[in-house]
């Protein structure tokens, strides 16, 4: 399929996707029939969309195009109410978090969808292992060239986004010692990590043509980069965050990305170059392994900075942009989180350290999601 032309969209508009876990009480393992829930709610959603993701234990909630985080929060709140009622009617529960703490990938059933079945054929068991749950945020752009500039700018802050959203320390019944373990799942994919370097949209079109020769890439949706342009929407899509445990944190993360995008495209503070990515995977690893306690390294100067310190610096820089787009509440909430030194991964570990079981942890996550 050829790459579509870049659809011009209103700059800084917002779209958010949340991949949710569908679980069976009282054991709280993943359920394998999200199709039943989708059928139950499809005529009751007035804004946004509830749809499939890769496997039958995943339920995706997606907003429409929103002007700001308040509109997105309203849509999510309405969807949440409908989905929770349908889940209760079918004796199921819903929760966030980047990984199910004790699920077995071998049990996961890929959705009966042509694209997902083709992906299963291409990638085999990797697709079943990819039953992990993330938050994706789209930001509108006026042109393809703006999208490429924004993608490179946002890539500088991938460690910050990962650390702030970290919510997957447990996998296969084990403490992984990572703050988010979810990003590691994609390391075997040939398109894992950052997009290959291009400097403008014309070069991106050439890149996509080259990738399509592999026969594994039929559309932009087949690319698993940390951040990717979405020409059919006219957006840049950030894909590195775990699904948070609460709607409020999901909205705050979206506000952070929207405000950062506004700052990047209005101030143009960087002259991007390929060398910017020299230490990308090392800095990304620091955020995954240590969360906010990680240390990132500047590829140009060799300077090393605590991620906590650099995140506070970012929040300060984007505060005026956040004010202009109505996202100040998100930046203030994230500032409090950074100062506290906590993320959701640490809260999960604290629950287990206090004697809680992993089954009890998932039960707690369901209560948190329903109560937010």
UniProtKB/Swiss-Prot annotation:
Quaternary context: Homodimer.
Cited HAMAP family: Glu_cys_ligase_2 (MF_01609)
Recorded catalytic activity of this chain's protein: L-cysteine + L-glutamate + ATP = gamma-L-glutamyl-L-cysteine + ADP + phosphate + H(+)
The keyword rRNA-binding is annotated on this UniProt entry: no
Phylogenetic placement of the source organism: Bacteria, Pseudomonadati, Pseudomonadota, Gammaproteobacteria, Enterobacterales
Keywords: ATP-binding, Ligase, Nucleotide-binding
InterPro entries, per the entry: GCL_type2/YbdK_subfam, GCS2, Gln_synth/guanido_kin_cat_dom, YbdK
Annotated protein name in UniProt: Putative glutamate--cysteine ligase 2
GO molecular function, one term: glutamate-cysteine ligase activity
Functional summary from the UniProt entry: ATP-dependent carboxylate-amine ligase which exhibits weak glutamate--cysteine ligase activity.
Keyword Transmembrane helix: no
Family recorded in the similarity comment: Belongs to the glutamate--cysteine ligase type 2 family. YbdK subfamily.
Disulphide bonds in the chain: none
Gene name as annotated: ybdK
Pfam families named among the record's database cross-references: GCS2 (PF04107)
EC number annotated for this UniProt entry: 6.3.2.2
GO biological process, one term: modified amino acid biosynthetic process
Uppermost EC category: ligase
């Amino acid at each position: 399929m050829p790459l579509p032309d870049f659809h011009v969209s209103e700059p800084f508009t917002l779209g958010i996707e949340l991949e949710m876990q569908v679980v069976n009480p009282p054991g709280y393992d993943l359920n394998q029939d999200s199709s039943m829930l989708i059928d139950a709610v499809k005529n009751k959603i007035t804004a946004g969309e509830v749809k499939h993701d890769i496997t039958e234990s995943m339920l995706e909630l997606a907003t429409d195009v929103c002007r700001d985080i308040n509109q997105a929060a309203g849509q999510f709140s309405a969807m949440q109410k409908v989905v929770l009622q349908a889940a209760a009617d079918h004796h199921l529960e819903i929760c966030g978090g980047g990984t199910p703490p004790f699920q077995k990938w071998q049990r996961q059933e890929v959705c009966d969808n042509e694209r997902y079945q083709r992906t299963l054929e291409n990638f085999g068991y990797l697709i079943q292992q990819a039953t992990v749950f993330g938050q994706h945020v789209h930001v509108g752009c006026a042109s393809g060239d703006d999208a490429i500039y924004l993608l490179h700018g946002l890539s500088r802050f991938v460690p910050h986004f990962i650390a702030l959203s970290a919510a997957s320390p447990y996998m296969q019944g084990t403490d992984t010692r990572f703050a988010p373990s979810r990003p590691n799942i994609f390391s075997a994919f040939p398109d894992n990590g950052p997009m290959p370097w291009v400097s403008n949209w014309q070069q991106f079109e050439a890149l996509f043509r080259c990738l399509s020769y592999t026969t594994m890439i039929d559309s932009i949706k087949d690319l698993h980069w940390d951040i990717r342009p979405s020409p059919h929407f006219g957006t840049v899509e950030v894909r590195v965050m775990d699904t948070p445990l609460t709607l409020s944190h999901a909205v705050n993360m979206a506000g952070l990305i929207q405000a950062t995008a506004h700052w990047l495209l209005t101030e143009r503070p960087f002259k991007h170059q390929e060398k910017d990515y020299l230490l990308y995977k090392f800095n990304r690893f620091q955020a995954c392994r240590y969360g906010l306690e990680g240390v990132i390294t500047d590829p140009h100067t060799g300077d090393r900075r605590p991620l906590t310190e650099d995140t506070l610096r970012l929040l300060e820089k984007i505060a005026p942009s956040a004010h202009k787009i109505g996202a100040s509440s998100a930046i203030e909430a994230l500032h409090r989180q950074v100062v506290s030194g906590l993320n959701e991964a640490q809260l999960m570990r604290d629950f287990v350290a206090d004697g809680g079981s992993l089954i009890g942890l998932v039960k707690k996550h369901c209560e948190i999601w329903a109560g937010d």
